[in-house]
Swiss-Prot record:
<feature type="binding site">
    <location>
        <position position="90"/>
    </location>
    <ligand>
        <name>AMP</name>
    </ligand>
</feature>
<keyword id="KW-0067">ATP-binding</keyword>
<dbReference type="GO" id="GO:0005737">
    <property type="term" value="C:cytoplasm"/>
</dbReference>
<feature type="binding site">
    <location>
        <position position="31"/>
    </location>
    <ligand>
        <name>AMP</name>
    </ligand>
</feature>
<feature type="binding site">
    <location>
        <position position="197"/>
    </location>
    <ligand>
        <name>ATP</name>
    </ligand>
</feature>
<feature type="binding site">
    <location>
        <position position="125"/>
    </location>
    <ligand>
        <name>ATP</name>
    </ligand>
</feature>
<feature type="binding site">
    <location>
        <position position="128"/>
    </location>
    <ligand>
        <name>Zn(2+)</name>
    </ligand>
</feature>
<comment type="similarity">
    <text>Belongs to the adenylate kinase family.</text>
</comment>
<dbReference type="GO" id="GO:0004017">
    <property type="term" value="F:adenylate kinase activity"/>
</dbReference>
<keyword id="KW-0862">Zinc</keyword>
<comment type="subunit">
    <text>Monomer.</text>
</comment>
<dbReference type="Pfam" id="PF00406">
    <property type="entry name" value="ADK"/>
</dbReference>
<feature type="binding site">
    <location>
        <begin position="10"/>
        <end position="15"/>
    </location>
    <ligand>
        <name>ATP</name>
    </ligand>
</feature>
<comment type="pathway">
    <text>Purine metabolism; AMP biosynthesis via salvage pathway; AMP from ADP: step 1/1.</text>
</comment>
<keyword id="KW-0547">Nucleotide-binding</keyword>
<dbReference type="Pfam" id="PF05191">
    <property type="entry name" value="ADK_lid"/>
</dbReference>
<feature type="region of interest" description="LID">
    <location>
        <begin position="124"/>
        <end position="161"/>
    </location>
</feature>
Amino acid sequence: MNIMLLGAPGCGKGTQAEQLVNKLNFIQVSTGDLMRKEISLNTRLGLKCQEYMNAGKYVPDQIVNQIVSQFLKNTNDKLIFDGYPRTLEQAKSLEQMLDLYNKKIDYVFYIDVNDQILIKRITNRLVCPLCKASFNLETRKPKQEGLCDFDNTKLVKRSDDSLDKVQIRLQTYKEQTLPLIDYFKTNSKFIEIKADDLSAEQVFNQIKGELKI
């Protein structure tokens, strides 16, 4: 069983992916992690990724898709796709790759949250620079103010979590990623979760209930 999580920045996709990995033993497909691994191994694809990143450019779909394809070839099912695909073209390429390895997306969960709530969540977010754990001054406060619950490292605010940058990210999401919702509505088991007033645990319980596991 493979699932996809869709939703705007700040909707809680990362938190749900973390829960699915920790509680239900799913494997998260992170294109960022996959690219960093290729770079650390100095592979041909890794060197290409590094070239684009050093220039401050997005790594082209063609390269990202090759890296994802390698991963899919050597991985069993029970995958979570979170943050990939971002565009319609990536989605179509992913379905072709999955088909090649006799895999498919079984469930697509769209976590829908109001823009004003998203902005408030993101601008209140703090992250641990060491373990990458995410906290929120509104919804997920650290046990000790300003410090990570897991390693006591001082929490920081991500540079792209400022109000102006959040607004740009939401606009980019609407232009590039919203079309995916219409696409997957007709291609997979599509489940929309209205999460404005739901806690992360309530969202997780809805997902778990749909998966029947």
